[in-house]
Amino acid sequence: MVGDDVREVLIKIVIFAGLSYLGLSLLAYFVQHRLTYFPDTSRIVPEAAGLRGVAEWVVETPDRERLVLWRADAKPGQPTILYFHGNAAGLANRAPRVAFFQSQGWGAVIMAYRGYAGSSGSPS
């Protein structure tokens, strides 16, 4: 009958949609690291990014990874900003922000996450 044919087609559509959803969910789970982090691995010194009076430091972590950070001193009586750059780009892309902090007399410490801007390791 026609009703049975429609029912059979609807069941196949629901099964296909469910399996497609499951497959896409599994794919997203297994590649989520690549969908979340977009590390810019290039290491640029502050001067090459147009910054003056900014020192580059390399800090070794207890698990022997190296983290690159930039440090600009504050003028007397002014605050120092601890700035984390987010999950895209690297330190050089934040140079205008550091320059703004300096123009206000503020200090800045900006660290490259693992896997970004010359820091070793990988983000997690």
For each of these PLM feature ranges, what is it?
Residues 5, 52-55, 109, 123:
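Compositionally biased, intrinsically disordered low-complexity regions
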Residues 61-124:
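Membrane-embedded segments
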Residues 2, 49-52, 76:
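Feature targets compositionally biased, intrinsically disordered low-complexity regions
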Residues 13-60:
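An N-terminal hydrophobic leader/cap segment in hydrolases
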Residues 1-7:
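N-terminal Lys/Arg-rich, disordered targeting/topogenic segments
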